Amino acid sequence: MKTLLLTFLVVTIVCLDLGYTLICHQVHGLQTCEPAQKFCQKRTTMFFPNHPVLLMGCTYNCPTERYSVCCSTDKCNK
């Protein structure tokens, strides 16, 4: 009986997703998101005319800009 309970406990712990955080691509490497950051983003913006800048990483909400991608799975913003 103890073996059965121990097995059940181990399976329960393995199946639970304790402390899961999202992983997103940045321009250089990967970023582990804060628990409240539920989305990865990839967007192109222009700070100066004819000079596009690529922004990638974790975000709290999805950008609504025209040239942006938002997703919610690990490494989905490549």
UniProtKB/Swiss-Prot annotation:
Keyword Oxidoreductase among record annotations: no
InterPro entries: Snake_3FTx, Snake_toxin-like_sf, Toxin_cobra-type
Transmembrane segments: none
Keyword Membrane: no
Signal peptide: 1-21
Keywords (A to Z) from UniProt: Acetylcholine receptor inhibiting toxin, Disulfide bond, Ion channel impairing toxin, Neurotoxin, Postsynaptic neurotoxin, Secreted, Signal, Toxin
Record family assignment: Belongs to the three-finger toxin family. Short-chain subfamily.
Name listed for the protein in its UniProt record: Short neurotoxin SNTX26
Organism whose genome encodes this protein: Ophiophagus hannah
